[in-house]
């Protein structure tokens, strides 16, 4: 029987709903209140506190289709993705859970029923494993389910491992909840190599685990003793990709409908024909994790979850580049993904535009350095004498070209090499140590190069100019000529290019002659010289050549806005938090600004809001940004702030923005504060003891950020409104059911007056809105009769009278209810067959209802 992945998902959830389980939505990929976990990687993550007894929910049975990511930390599948049939960065885990409700027998019976009755898998294709001492689970499988003993495998502890160190024994840690588990395997047939679990050939692909049932029945103490839990629980997980492969008659997860759709979409976006290529599998997998991480609020960055996302994006982009992708392609897969995910893609559809934009920008940014980085990596591999690429080269690719180490490892592995991971980590640690010692941003580029040139900087007033090449260096050695492809450092006699300093990154652009073009990828200080780092894109270049030096004006303009905003931010922080605030580092780029400052505690939401208000106030005032050259002592006397870690000459450049900010600064700035447009803080957090970090965006970047936040907010509001409406409906349904139940009990209180059925009763705490339905039910049951009900709820009296149509010529409901209402401090009326009223005197209600019989008798 063929089933699509979406059909499998819906069948699983519906089956367990029929067994009394509450369907719970997938939680975010960013775990809530669990700092130990990088990403949600199992269905049980959102129920962790339920299993630990720290949280009680309205249900004791739950079922989910949980989105999971394994691409960082302990559970890291990234390096295997695309190279095996079943490794993914993103997957969905189907699960059913019992929190002290049912246990082993029901869990096993449910699993077997779903697999063999709902999915109709051949029983002879299934075999199971149990923990070696779990006789209870063995007997359930054997005697209750009927699986032959030779298809139930006992799995013990790993050789040389600790007690309970087994694939069939689950434990949260050295202490705490733990217990045995039973796993269900599917036999793909003897045409595929591999043996059953526990055999020497168990790593083959013939027998594939499809479902794991964990039985949390013990609490392990520090001394190793196992105490039975008073309410044992069940945690199960079944990867939807694996079971879908079986239902679709394929062996590899990448052959199921979801991946085939994405592989075809990737091939179309890239312009590649061979759908069996492994790189397409990598791209198809990675779009799932990247898209859903962004949906759940993770954005590409150089830290934490954001860096894992960046690594995955760059790995996908590199594989697309390998297949010949021209321009950005990765973001084009978001639409096909949203469609093929079916019921699991609803949220992605809502945020599709945001996800596409984030991916496109990230891909374009990486694309600027990808080709050159690949060229350097391939050259290094070509020249390799052994089989291991040194850690320094791996680090250089990471540090200069944004190549994550696992991306470099992928390329090396494709060519039969490996990387020196230990050497890379050592280089990383050395960089961290330099950063700690310096207490600021920036790296000492080419410290061994010595230049005799004193470059004149002319970039404050111009972004292009005529210059002469004074010196050129390749890999630290001075050269006189350069040709196409050479990566080099060029020193000019004068330059409009700003060298990285004071946290502002260096300019990029081009150096042009009639004979060649040099792409400047970075600009750094080299003693008194300014070093242009880059590569010869075409032609040749020689010492003494005259060049047109042209800065990337758009990028510089964006940087200048962020730099000016940094000054306003610094001043605003000192006004809001206090004069103790001092800059401890900064990074000003075209996309964002980052500002580190001294402060002992996290900023409150109110403080962040006030800082933003002050900065934007100064932006709207549109101060002219003025610069003056003066003696450093004079500058300090005027209150100019000096930047942390910077060295100053006797004569300094003082930058002023009205009377709000005055700082010593040699950077490039906007002309007026109004040019900044808008300032928005996007994050605030601690990076070390007493050091906080703010990241912010300006201008169009701020607008883009706000648009993205608004999109997420709107989606959440819509979701909450829909849930609230559903809850209101469910509450009313429950009230109606309760009223119907109460009306069934009232029928026994019917009396006869002059041969007519009469029911007079008082209720307490009933829902007044439900009384009308209750009277309708009673009228239907009596066929002929008169009903008068009084109810006291929250100190108020509710009255309702009902008369069947055959009696309205004698007794009218409106008159009856008004008679009672007048006695309880109210009044009312209505139709002859149905009328309602209210009152304020609850104490008078019993006597008022006692008067009803006589009133009715007078009219019959």
From Swiss-Prot:
Catalytically driven reaction(s): tRNA(Ala) + L-alanine + ATP = L-alanyl-tRNA(Ala) + AMP + diphosphate
Binding site for Zn(2+): 563, 567, 665, 669
Domain notes: Consists of three domains; the N-terminal catalytic domain, the editing domain and the C-terminal C-Ala domain. The editing domain removes incorrectly charged amino acids, while the C-Ala domain, along with tRNA(Ala), serves as a bridge to cooperatively bring together the editing and aminoacylation centers thus stimulating deacylation of misacylated tRNAs.
Cofactor descriptive note: Binds 1 zinc ion per subunit.
EC number(s) recorded for this UniProt protein: 6.1.1.7
The protein's name in its UniProt record: Alanine--tRNA ligase
Family statement drawn from the similarity comment of this UniProt entry: Belongs to the class-II aminoacyl-tRNA synthetase family.
GO CC, alphabetical: cytosol
Record function comment: Catalyzes the attachment of alanine to tRNA(Ala) in a two-step reaction: alanine is first activated by ATP to form Ala-AMP and then transferred to the acceptor end of tRNA(Ala). Also edits incorrectly charged Ser-tRNA(Ala) and Gly-tRNA(Ala) via its editing domain.
Cofactors required: Zn(2+)
GO terms of biological process kind: alanyl-tRNA aminoacylation; negative regulation of DNA-templated transcription
Key words, A-Z: Aminoacyl-tRNA synthetase, ATP-binding, Cytoplasm, Ligase, Metal-binding, Nucleotide-binding, Protein biosynthesis, RNA-binding, tRNA-binding, Zinc
Originating species: Vibrio cholerae serotype O1 (strain ATCC 39315 / El Tor Inaba N16961)
Top-level taxonomic group: Bacteria
Subcellular location as annotated: Cytoplasm
